[in-house]
């Protein structure tokens, strides 16, 4: 292995190949790598000799490890190894890489042919880093890697080839290929020199590759498909690489850079010689590459085409005659190639071969081998390569020898097949364009080159004519006109349209363009040829006219119109006369008489388009050429007609023909007329037309209708004429060019006439005025005439308004009449008819109103009239039209209003912006005054709807008008002007209260009604526009000027559709929070309200008996308007922190200053000060406490409070008070200064503000009330004393409770019990009275129902003051109870004087009374409901009247003890009314007029002990037994059948008798709420019963048998399953929508707790989301209590999408908790038997039950599915010992039956199965019907024995057998049973 021979002879002047290679490489690290490979045996050769190569052992260990991993078969391992190797190579430079290169080169050659493209790409990345790091040191290896390097550039995978090209890119263009080899050889000459240097090695490498086969490609065992793919990749890349290399090396040298030619010429010459010799060798050895042409691989065939093209271009000398003969069929007959990826290289090869070797055509049968395949190729749309193949067709015609085809047949077949391929291109407009472009080029080429195919001139002409006739006329033109050979019957034409793209508009346009270009080309070539096409088309057209088939004629004319439009579009007319003189002129000349006589619509359109295209003065001579008329002079052809002659022809022929008659063709004839208008003759022609129309008087001619259509056409003509380049310069481009005195005079006379109100008159006026749309502003009358027309229209509108039945509309009319309008209200014309006429005109010309902007008065009046009529139209829905006469009267009037409403709908922002600002402002002012009049005057309309309508209309108009802020404020100010009816509480000018004394009651009530209605209007405006528009509208006068409006609204209190607390006050608060300077406004409001209350409180002396107001609910109890407004206003100010301590102190000072007038007390102030003190006392005390130690801050409040306490102490005890004395006011004042709270923290905070002296005085005042017990009779006679006493007790307990002694507590309790007991007595008497009344009328006739309900109302209406007294007592007791509970929980030293042994019995006794109140109201409603639902509603409405009282009752009922409830129930049952305690609870819960707190209380009592056991099952049933099912074995006696069990009627109707109509109700409907509550109760009751007891099993069986599963469907109407679509299931709880999270949490909580009480507690007020939560909780309870029931429902679902969503919801949110609960219960279960054990696997959700008996045993595996319990539990036998297969199968089936049918815990099912197995071992025989000892449903034993065969059966099984078989025979022996 020595050195190579010849080294010694090498001269110094000749460098070695390695040194030359090194010179080509840049220094440093600018080298990169390409794509290489291996061929034949060379793949195993190293690139260096043994002497120069580095030892493998010298490699870095890590590099060596990765190189070794490259020989692995796994592509993933290779990719990871290459990635690691790439990083290692990056870290090395220069000489460090030399040891790596030999081994890497070896691996590189193997890797470039790897099957995985990722491996090949990663290989090039490593090679890039190797060459980059090695730099010039890679030179010795260059020749060995250049072949693979070059080969790698052409990998079929683009990402791999790009990775290779990124390092070796040749930046020169060779032929059509650009190859970039940049990084390794950045200089262009070095790149070329590198290829020259290594050319021999590259050719050798490629030659070796081409010799390989799939069998010898690899030494590894690979799959055949992988081998085939690798082979195709290698061959195609080698072929393309070879073609590219030949193009580069054998190209013509570039002489522009000849400076270095001498130095490089030898190397280049050598490379060219090597290339030529190698090419000859390979061409010969591979037999012209014919085998590759026949390959099944498209990539190999495409590469072969490219290679042959390169050979033809670069080494044509290699082609011998035999080679040409061999290749001719393969290349010229190549049109069988159907793979579009090959077509580009295919066409290049075919064209080059045919051009280079034209003699090749003689070696084959052209028709058979070429043309047949070419026709097929064209018919198939070039097999998907239209963009490539169609442009090549003309080149193919050029190179195809003429003598090889028959010209007369060739071209016809060529174009037929070419155009047949259009059906394959219909999806792409680009492909269609390519097809038609090729058609045009090839056709014109055929005409120009006809001489190539013919020697004789006549033959040339005949060929050209033949082409025009057979191709242009019969194919292209026929296709364009959708005709074939002259005509296609309609039935065949329809089928023809469905083929290809004949009916495609875009295709037809392009086809027409193609025909036009061909015709233009023919005209340039020889004009005489054009006549053959024109004559053929004309003859065909005229033949159709003669045949008379109008449908075919119309279609042909439409296509001719299309062709004319294309002529105009593509500007074919420029400089060419043939379109008219040769084509259209003769055709129109002969067709005009037929068109004129037939008046075919499309024929007239054809004339119009022809005139438009060519011009009237050119077309008219053609049309009249054959008409002999004495009045017409002859016209010389081909010359424009003179204006005079044109006018004469226009007058005598075209005007009469186009304007006579009015039919379907009139529009088309008028279009023709307009097209004939010549610019020079325009004025005369238009005047002639107008005169002719108005002068026609013959019968049947409608002048106005004809003019209307004519004017619309004129409007379009104006638009068309003004859109050109000469804008507004051309005659007829401006509206005034079309004005005519006859038009104006006719329009004016029509609008002022009372008889001309026809539809045609309306349409004529609308067409004259214009303005039908926003853009239609063209009018045909002058401005003065326009004003006269609209004055006439306005007069008609005002006459209509004047006769309005609404007084406000009628009243407003007078303000709209202006002097310029001659308005005669006494006219006898039909107002409805003329108003309808005017409305229709305005509707059709609305936007022409903008032209009246200069006449502001007229336009304002017109717009205002429209506003008023439109509002009347909107108000008609509020009129009571119960009388038929009223309906009839309004019917015609509404018809007019509807038109005006349509006008108003057009008034948008864009319209109003076009109107003069002064007009907009005046219109707004008129509208404001009109709306004000409507609200104040219309007493008979629905008030709320009326005010809402007026406010909405005002808001809409203000938004449209876009007025300035100041003008808008002025408009709002107009609405607040004072009138006779409004305001009624405060004067706007003086802000003083208005005195209404002495006003008649009826008038006063009327004024209040109007005022409430107007406040409703203002409030609606505030809601829509914002309160700032009215409160701070006039900033010049400040806030105070508008404070009166706030006071007026506050005093009004309620109005239609709103009230102060829910509407105005929230808006005011929000405004004041956002407006820092609103303090002055609030102070002004307070001042006005306080002064008004002081003045008016004396009027409400009797209404102030009870001042203890719930500020959130019952503030309406304050009757006096100013005081009520003042209290609510102060309450909201402090509640929302708008006022604080400072403002409270200022108010305190103001009110106390008014308390005394000199030495006398102001009685009015004394009456109202308690209300104010009750609100401001808390911030006052806070202010005093925070004021520090200064005495000045302590004196005012503390001194006054002490004085008031001392003043109250000076009075006798309340029990001695007599009516008429004024001590009540002082007591109320004192009590108001000591607020109480049932919240302990607030109570302690209040107590801390009290000084010792105050507490002492307060306690003394309380104890003073215990004096003189003999006055008890007075107490019962004065309810006010009871109220004050109850409140004083509350205060004393709250503030002085720790100082109470035993007597004090006795006094408190005795009074509370007495007051509450008095209400109990009243309620019990009411219940008894209702019971007696209903019992007495139950048999009465239905006619007396109204009397019965009236009598019932008298009974339940309780006016007894004991209810109010008891309400205060309940408040006191509730407060005391809260304080005691807080003491017991927190262990605080509060109320230490009250011992538990004292409190507990008193509490129970009082709560018993409260429960009796609760049951009484329920009993009363239940008894009334037994008569009718209306009766029950009357009872329920009484509770709403005493809402606060019953809410206190409900709160205390929930807090009552089980013992108190039990005693109350017993008392009710002992009472003996017609309804019991449970019925009363259901009556409250399902009340028709429910109170949420009472409903919750009823549910709580029904769902908890001791009532829950009585709540579900009907009274006639035996109580549900708690006896264990284990005790049933001994005897069956005493076990009642489940068939006897009945649910209570209240529950049964919602469980068993559920109606499908429930699914159609609203999601918050009362029916749904009641149903869900009933089911929640039922499920909670079942869950509370002990497991495996008779009672629970009977109830469960009854539910499963009778309950309607519709409940589950209704539940999932609430649960938002749609939120589970998509990816929702994969999200965590925090990511899912909140609506779904709440429902899921409710379901999970119900499963865990076994109760839905927490969800029910938050149910009210009823909302959709809360109902969804309850639905989720009920579903969770069902899954826990009735799993088998739910599973049966789920299994019967047919909606797959819904079932999958339900399963997903259950699996995610319910199943985990259920499975955890089941496994936990099984784990805790005590089976009490050594023979039975259970083991649990929580991870696998499995339970293994092991049963052993007498050396036999069996393991049963119970597996819970992830969507348990919707999917059944799976049971398998894991192991069995000593048990027969039959018994094993039997036990397995029995376990499956028990666990799958168990409605309860699985632990219960396992326990029952264990008992079943025990019984079998004890010898108990199983039931022959169900094959089980224990029945799976009722768990009974077989006890019914057949008297004949003695077998025993379960009773349930035997009953079912009898039922299904319809005979009572033993199932076994068939003997009678």
UniProtKB/Swiss-Prot annotation:
Localization: Cytoplasm, Cytosol
Function: E3 ubiquitin-protein ligase. Component of the ribosome quality control complex (RQC), a ribosome-associated complex that mediates ubiquitination and extraction of incompletely synthesized nascent chains for proteasomal degradation. Ubiquitination leads to CDC48 recruitment for extraction and degradation of the incomplete translation product.
Principal EC category: transferase
GO molecular-function term, one example from the UniProt record: zinc ion binding
EC code(s) of this entry: 2.3.2.27
Gene3D superfamilies: Leucine-rich Repeat Variant, Zinc/RING finger domain, C3HC4 (zinc finger)
Residue ranges with Basic and acidic residues bias: 1-10
Name of the protein this chain belongs to: E3 ubiquitin-protein ligase listerin
Subunit structure: Component of the ribosome quality control complex (RQC), composed of at least the E3 ubiquitin ligase LTN1 and NEMF. The complex probably also contains TCF25 as well as CDC48 and its ubiquitin-binding cofactors. RQC forms a stable complex with 60S ribosomal subunits.
Major subcellular site: cytoplasm
ZnF bounds (RING-type): 1823-1870
One Pfam family matching this protein: LTN1_E3_ligase_6th
